[in-house]
Amino acid sequence: MDNLLTALILSIVEGLTEFLPVSSSGHLILAGDLLGFVGEKAATFDVVIQLGAIMAVVVLYWKRFWGLVRPQPYARFAGRRGIVLLMLTSLPACILGLLLHAYIKEYLFRPATVLIALVVGAICMILVEKRKFKPTCISLDDMTPRLALGIGCFQCLALWPGFSRSAATIMGGMLLGAKRPLAAEYSFIAAVPIMVAATGYDLLKNLSMFTAADIPFFLVGMIGSFVSALLAVKVFVALVGRMTLIPFACYRLLIAPFVYYFMVN
């Protein structure tokens, strides 16, 4: 298949799934396997095209990010405090990711491990939604250091490809007292620093394997993921207040047999 067409297909998969609790890395690994695009370069491409999805969130939530630089009076998720909260959320996964980076890329970016993560993540989502609790945190201005760090610890689950960073942080937020729409919103915003760190680290480690001829391939990937992520986040934000995570869990369980049949068996 033409390289640019492969890049476009994978970028659309990335953009549509990055911020939904269905696992973008899992879908990318499986799509890449079907398209015959596998190996070290494919794994790095999957990370790099996240830049497009990151930019989509920055565009959609630009006021929140601008508030980190130029805080408004009475805004609590802003300025130095907002930056500290995001750092607390990013820190656990950054530390664990640095320690386990080689192991993760060597052993966890495989269809079999993705399949297990899809199923385990789906079961966890159903259990969280079945749990009755009263939210104590309604808006971003209610965020506390304890809640931010707790969500960061749950985010470590996303180092297992197939589990879903979005699912991990939304579930973590809900279990720790955040209302579902807030957990989703914070999940999107908190994704930016951790994804920038992961992308930058991967690029620095693997820069030597790329040439100028790869630039169009990556540009198509980033543009495609940007446009599709804009659409996906807008739709998810509109729905998350009215629906639970259970439909996404069911989707994960439904695709698991196909993953097993086409990728593992």
Swiss-Prot record:
Signal peptide: none
UniProt GO MF annotations: undecaprenyl-diphosphatase activity
Pfam family of the protein (one): BacA
Subcellular location, principal: membrane
Cell compartment(s), UniProt: Cell inner membrane
Classification via HAMAP family: Undec_diphosphatase
Family label: Belongs to the UppP family.
Protein name, entry field: Undecaprenyl-diphosphatase
Organism listed in the record: Desulfovibrio desulfuricans (strain ATCC 27774 / DSM 6949 / MB)
